[in-house]
């Protein structure tokens, strides 16, 4: 859990993914399109991956555990939440507020 | 269970070829009628005719005379009664005339049957779209040909048929009230109902995707012109915005800006989902082609591909979620009256696509 928090606040935008997860790929692509360059942590490549996956599920209710998106160190949500925030424009505002993008 | 299932596939699959069989059969009966025609009589009156000739009742001209018995009769009698030649010739002419009339009537009858068949085919198509094939309670689909008998899909097709009917009704209602006078509270409840109706479709699709995601993705439940625009089991929200934008009432500058931003957001989200789908296709192809191709045993490959495919359902749901959120956001941007006009325009756009599909489907079948 500590490790999730540490990694999540390391950068303005952080996404926990798995290398095999295609929806994660979509969410990453969306962030790149918005001009952000999020830190990507692939849980299936990390020795502590399973622990972090459990933490994401338990603490943030992220189900499925990935993708799990953090902006400005705060949990934004899963793919569904990210799309909602993107459509109503608030994702962009969050990214601006935490200096993940400037425009 | 398998015997029932194999039983059940042919009606739908072979449906396309059935007309060919029909025509084949008619062709044969046509041939046999032609051969009857050379005798100038339909089957059922051959015998009385022959009897009459045997009895030398030659005044009878109502039936044909060109068949073999007639010929025999004619040759036998000419030497004795030369004037009979004229009578025979007249009878032959008469018989030939009648034969031509019968042939004409027969061809006309064939033509009518052809039109009837086309009509039946169209009805069958329509019924199929409304999901009138019988579900038989088989719940396994391990052999992959089961989308026709999956009860979840059968229920979805039925529900979708009702859904379209209800949508048509709502469009009519919106059209009527927008032409008349209606207060904003009533209009808002109509608009909210129409929105809920779309959300209901997303809910239906989500449970259908659980039953058979390939069926939902294929768009088989939609008409062909609608399928042409298919993107992950439905329409691209950005396409719809593009189509609808000129049909809204006058928008304020702020509204225009909001709608443009929304369109851009939609496009970005669509691109992102499309790229995820592409990755899914790549990994699936890699999965299926893993190991040595051609060695004959591929159960592990198929199993691991099955696991990958699970992700497909989440893409259909996510795409519908994007559609859902886009509708909501439009409603936030627009006034109630503008939203009502927008929903009317959207509904009529779908109606026109459905009309286009059926016109296109019947274009070659018009009698020339």
Curated annotation (Swiss-Prot), chain A:
Keywords: Cytoplasm, Disulfide bond, Electron transport, Redox-active center, Transport. Residues 1-102 form the Glutaredoxin domain. It is found in: Cytoplasm. PROSITE patterns: GLUTAREDOXIN_2 (PS51354). InterPro entries: GlrX-like_pln_2 (IPR011905), Glutaredoxin (IPR002109), Thioredoxin-like_sf (IPR036249). Gene3D superfamilies: Glutaredoxin. It comes from the Eukaryota. GO terms for cellular component: cytoplasm. GO terms for biological process: negative regulation of transcription by RNA polymerase II. Its main location: cytoplasm. Disulfide bonds join 21-24. Pfam families: Glutaredoxin. Has a glutathione-disulfide oxidoreductase activity in the presence of NADPH and glutathione reductase. Reduces low molecular weight disulfides and proteins. Belongs to the glutaredoxin family. CC-type subfamily. This is Putative glutaredoxin-C12.
Swiss-Prot record, chain B:
It comes from the Eukaryota. Residues 83-131, 261-281 form a coiled coil. One of its GO terms (molecular function) is transcription cis-regulatory region binding. The keyword Nucleus applies. InterPro entries: bZIP, bZIP_sf, TGA_domain. It is found in: Nucleus. One of its GO terms (biological process) is DNA-templated transcription. Residues 84-104 are annotated as: Basic motif. One of its GO terms (cellular component) is nucleus. Residues 110-124 are annotated as: Leucine-zipper. Residues 53-83 are annotated as: Disordered. Predominantly expressed in roots. Keywords: Activator, Coiled coil, Disulfide bond, DNA-binding, Nucleus, Transcription, Transcription regulation. Residues 53-65 have a biased composition (Polar residues). Residues 82-145 form the bZIP domain. Residues 153-363 form the DOG1 domain. Disulfide bonds join 260-266. SMART domains: BRLZ. Binds DNA as a dimer. The reduced form interacts with NPR1. Belongs to the bZIP family. This is Transcription factor TGA1. It comes from Arabidopsis thaliana. The gene is TGA1.
């Amino acid at each position: 859990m500590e490790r999730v928090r540490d990694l999540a606040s390391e950068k303005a935008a952080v996404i926990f993914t798995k290398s095999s997860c295609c929806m994660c790929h979509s969410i990453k692509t969306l962030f790149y399109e918005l001009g952000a360059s999020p830190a990507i942590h692939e849980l299936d490549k990390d020795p502590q991956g399973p622990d972090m996956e459990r933490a994401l599920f338990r603490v943030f209710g992220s189900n499925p555990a990935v993708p799990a998106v953090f902006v400005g160190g705060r949990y934004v949500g899963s793919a569904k939440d990210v799309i909602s925030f993107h459509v109503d424009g608030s994702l962009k505002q969050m990214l601006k507020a935490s200096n993940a993008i400037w425009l | 269970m398998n015997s029932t299932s194999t039983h059940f596939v042919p009606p739908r699959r072979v449906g396309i070829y059935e007309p060919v069989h029909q025509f084949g059969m008619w062709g044969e009966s046509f041939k046999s009628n032609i051969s009857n025609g050379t005798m100038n009589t339909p089957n059922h009156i051959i015998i009385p005719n022959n009897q009459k000739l045997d009895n030398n009742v030659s005044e009878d001209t109502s039936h044909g005379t060109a068949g073999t018995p007639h010929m025999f009769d004619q040759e036998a009698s000419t030497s004795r009664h030369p004037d009979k030649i004229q009578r025979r010739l007249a009878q032959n002419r008469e018989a030939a005339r009648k034969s031509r009339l019968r042939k004409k009537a027969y061809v006309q009858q064939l033509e009518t049957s052809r039109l009837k068949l086309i009509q039946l085919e169209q009805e069958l198509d329509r019924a199929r779209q409304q999901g009138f094939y019988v579900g038989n309670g088989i719940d396994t689909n391990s052999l992959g040909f089961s989308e026709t008998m999956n009860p979840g899909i059968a229920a979805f097709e039925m529900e979708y048929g009702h859904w379209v009917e209800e949508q048509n009704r709502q469009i009519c209602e919106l059209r009527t009230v927008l032409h008349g006078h209606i207060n904003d509270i009533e209009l808002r409840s109509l608009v909210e109902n129409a929105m809920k109706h779309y959300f209901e479709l997303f809910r239906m699709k989500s449970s259908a995707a659980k039953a058979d995601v390939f069926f939902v993705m294929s768009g088989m439940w939609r008409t062909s012109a609608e399928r042409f625009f298919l993107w992950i089991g439905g329409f691209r929200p950005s396409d719809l915005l593009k189509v609808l934008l000129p049909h809204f009432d006058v928008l304020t500058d702020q509204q225009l800006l909001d709608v443009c931003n929304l369109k851009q957001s939609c496009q970005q989200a669509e691109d992102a989902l499309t790229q995820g789908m592409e990755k899914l296709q790549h990994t699936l192809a890699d999965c299926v082609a893993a190991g040595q191709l051609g060695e004959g045993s591929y159960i592990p490959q198929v199993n691991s591909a099955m696991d990958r495919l699970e992700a497909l359902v989440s893409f259909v749901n996510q795409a519908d979620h994007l559609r859902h959120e886009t509708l909501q956001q439009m409603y936030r941007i627009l006034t109630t009256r503008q939203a009502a006009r927008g929903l009317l325009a959207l509904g009529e756009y779908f109606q026109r696509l459905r009309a286009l599909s059926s016109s296109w489907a019947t274009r070659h079948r018009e009698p020339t």
